[in-house]
Amino acid sequence: MGDVAPGAGLARRDFLRVGGMLAAGLSTMPLFGACASIRRPTDFNVEEATIVDIQVAMTAGRLDSESLVQIYLQRIQELDRTGPMLRAVQEINPDAIAIARTLDAERSGRGPRSLLHGIPVLLKDNIATADKMETTAGALALVGARPRQDATIVQRLRQAGAVILGKASMSEWAYFKSTPSSSGWSARSGQSRNPYVLNRTPCGSSSGSAIAVAANLVTASIGTETDGSIICPSGVNGVVGIKPTVGLTSRAGVIPISATQDTVGAFGRTVADATAVLSAMVGVDPRDPATQASGGLTRTDYIQYLEATGLPGARIGVPREGYFGYSPKADALANQAIDVLRQKGAVIVDPVKIPNFDRVTLTAAEITVLLYEFKAGVNAYLAGLAPGAQVRTLDDIIEFNKRNAGDNLPFFGQELLVRAQAKGGLDDPEYLEALEKCRRLGGKEGFDVAMNENRLDAMVAPTTTPAWPIDLVNGDQFRGSSAKSAALAGYPLISVPAGQASGLPVGITFMGRAWSEPTLIKLAYGFEQATKARRPPQYLGTLPV
């Protein structure tokens, strides 16, 4: 094999082979044959490098985690702090180099812990770490507010040997502060940018997590989703995003919006990388009651479902009504993707109707649920902080923003915070009625009916539109996405790059029932391997006329 770019000839068997050898603690010798695609340490090309590329290089002694962290820090300086100024990275973990050095020593002495050993990962800024970093959800009001312990998923990533490189920027309060608003803006970071065309939105609220992976500022990242906050940034930034079933990953230690819709997921440049990160995070957690439902339904390793032959015979539905029609360019690429799925042996059921899918009615019920749950969840999170926080209640946050309006409210208001504060408790009939409507119409009388009547394994649709221009006066020009039914029902999604429209990435989303991650991973991986549609960003200032 010739000297090619990282990631170029590594199929699923390489991923499984390397993972098995790492787990077994075997010597480096059997891996030399897989190393031909890896450059020497002095010219290791981190751009588009996968977890397997990196692990092969590390196992062969051609790279170490400390060097990898240094490479990413240099790229962050060149692309995030200067140059295109992406503003994807909220802050750097001051201990990242020391952690990487310790993990390198452990690798030399005892071998790697997992596929994530020594792999740098960014966390969305609403995921708690009890270290030297802040956890603020992009809000100045939470600067100095210290969590008492790491979020559970952070504990699991650390146990797997991941290097927490830093915190990724995000839409402030996970895009639950005002309407209108601008995705990717926060008082702490300012406006983050889409790396493909810099004056375009990165979407949100997991903006920085997606940007950083797209721009090769980190190997993989963690985000959260309530309704579209992983899937939309994945689509417009040309990366893979996995939004798991609610309860598959713990939300303990995550600044919340919704107890019934929030979930923690992964971003990668490939389905394999995002899947490897997901595998490290799943499992029951006594700190999050929602995970109790996952007992016996989770897998310790989702990598086994990376099957390039996962498409033949799969029944995939196409929900035209409500999921297509808001972007001709996205529709065109989605239709091309559907043709690929059909050519690769999938049985396409087109069209499929999801009953009771009235976006206006569902959104009205959803916002009611979120207002109630946000107030309850944020107050509980703030009450559990260590001493010294400058805010302890949602009302404190609102008043802080009023006192410091120049910094906190320069473009938009905080009407969602105010509306949430006006709500009562979670025993309020208005809340209970709205929640029942969301679950019933989104799931068992909506998405579930379409899946069952058509005997589907999954559905597929455009992820969202190509990225729209950033507008700090009028806010986002959001027209639609694939997230709504899954958000209301708590179901999983995987967005995969499907191509580009005028230089802007477009994704397609695979949608499934609760706990159907194995099926979705098979389908997403099969499509990815058939198309290889991802292209690295070019950092254009604007689109050519």
Please give the residue ranges for each predicted region.
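Short glycine/serine-rich loop/turn segments
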Residues: L116-V264, P289-A293, G317-E321, N454, ...
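Structural helix-boundary/capping segments
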Residues: E78, V163, A214-R320, N335-Q343, ...
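Short helix-loop capping/hinge segments that flank enzyme active sites or metal/cofactor-binding pockets
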Residues: H117-A137, I303-P319, V369-G443, D448, ...
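Glycine-rich, small-residue loops and helix-cap segments
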Residues: G61, G118, K124, Q159, ...
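Short connector loops at secondary-structure junctions
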Residues: A346-A365
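Short, well-ordered alpha-helical
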Residues: G2, V18-V143, W173-Y175, Q292-I303, ...
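Short, well-ordered beta-strand elements within core beta-sheets of diverse protein domains
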Residues: D53-A60, A141-A145, D262-R269, F510-M511
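N-terminal secretory signal peptides
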Residues: M1-D14
